[in-house]
UniProtKB/Swiss-Prot annotation:
One Pfam family this sequence matches: BRO1
GO cellular component: ESCRT III complex; plasma membrane
Gene field: palC
Family (UniProt): Belongs to the palC family.
Function, in words: Required for the proteolytic cleavage of the transcription factor pacC in response to alkaline ambient pH.
Compositionally biased spans, kind Basic and acidic residues: 375-391
Annotated ranges, domain BRO1: 1-288
Listed CDD domains: BRO1_UmRIM23-like (cd09245)
Region (Disordered): 375-405, 439-507
GO biological process: cellular response to pH; penicillin biosynthetic process; positive regulation of penicillin biosynthetic process; regulation of secondary metabolite biosynthetic process
Name recorded for this polypeptide: pH-response regulator protein palC
InterPro entries associated with the record: BRO1_dom (IPR004328), BRO1_sf (IPR038499), pH-resp_palC (IPR037505)
Amino acid sequence: MVYPFELPTTSHLSFQSALSSHTHPSLPQSATTARHALRLALKAHNRLPRGFQRDSHLTSVLSAINDYLPYVVALAQGLNNGKPIDTTTPSTTTHLEEIRVAQRAELEPEWRATLASSSLRRPSTNRTRGTGVQYELAFILTTLGYILSSLARSGVTRTLYASTTPSAEQRTAAVQTATKHLLQASTIHSFLSSSPYFATVSEAATLPDLAPATQAALSSLALAEATLLTVLKDDSYVVACIQARNPNDKDWMVRAPEIPKVRAHLFARLCIRAAEYAEQAATGLSSVAAEGRKAGVDEDVARYAHVLGLVARARACRFFGVDAELAGKVGEGIAWLRAAKGALGLRNTGSASAEEVTTKSRGLSKLKLGFRERREERKLEKGAGGERVDKGGLGPGDNAGREEEGRVLEMLETKWVRANDTLNTQLIPSSADYVANLPSGRDVLPPQPPYTPPSLDEERLFQMRGPPTELELNPGSDDGDSDFESQAAGDAHTPGAFPGRADNAYY
């Protein structure tokens, strides 16, 4: 599916104390006001419990960051003598009036990193301080990419795993919207990794969040997820498997789930391309720690990218098996399914071929082999990640889709082996070399135009030509957002008090 990124939080920052503009005197103060709204939205978001409440709040955070982003871009252009911050792409908007901003003091924004390894994120006051508006803009764009990925994830999972089975139109609309969000996130991360404007930020930053290799890897990861979602839109096997597990679905009383013929060979090539994107992301994320920084990217993200590549290759093997089964080669199709299970680290429960039986050891060697297989399986399960699902609820099981793909493989293998044992009786070839001999991938996503930062419209620029008004913003305490998920009010009650009450009276 899509990785659930944590959104960073930030401390209070006053632009008017460090910047001034003689062309638009109200610009620094307006930027401070918009940033304060974003800061409150991020704090409120991370205090919500994971699940539906946090997913529903994403639109509020997106609205706040879209309102604030043009102000930061205007400040950056004003400090850049009115020139666009990215000279590699032509600007789509031209201002009738030029923005000039002067720097009176050093601007030092503070942001909490969310991709750094857990060993560096352990302290409660782990914000990193940067210098310049480049640092602020880089973190804002990175956060925007996380929000778009989170919107894509929540939209797909809430539709596919709803209590009522979605229609084909609902499924298509959800996947198309999620793909659009992921493509936007990919262009943003690519812009951060390639723009020379952020070169000084990446060199000075000690955390891996803003490193060019990290941003390039996140761009590839978003492309891998978008490609897999494109395949998922027409993957009737996953839909049938989810519908079979849905306790609220009653369509089976009327008719069996329809599984139309799919363009199996094309889908397999698309999944291979998604695997190539995911492997590029995993390599890039793993290499960040070797660039002389204090810490690398969190292992959960790197493991997720690695497992996502395995899931994509396993899905490609499944579609090759479907293609063989549609051609009447059910034995070859079963071999492809077992190759897919091997790629996922799942043990084959079906009957093994004669070649596989003769190569198995006996005694202690066989016991060691079983322990090694279980250890590798647990490692892949840990790397796939997961989310909490309410008791009796329906959910994907893990972030990378490994568990869902394993269910589909088990369903197809059980069906095909039964048919082969009773009707076809075809020999099942060895699946040892199937994954290694996969063809190259094929792109399905259209080329995306380079990301262009938004600019303020002429009406708002005209309003900021006047003098600033008195602004009173309470920075508040930064201790309240030290944790991403706040504890409930009743969890920290006084001993002897009734949980959930503010008083501590005895009765």
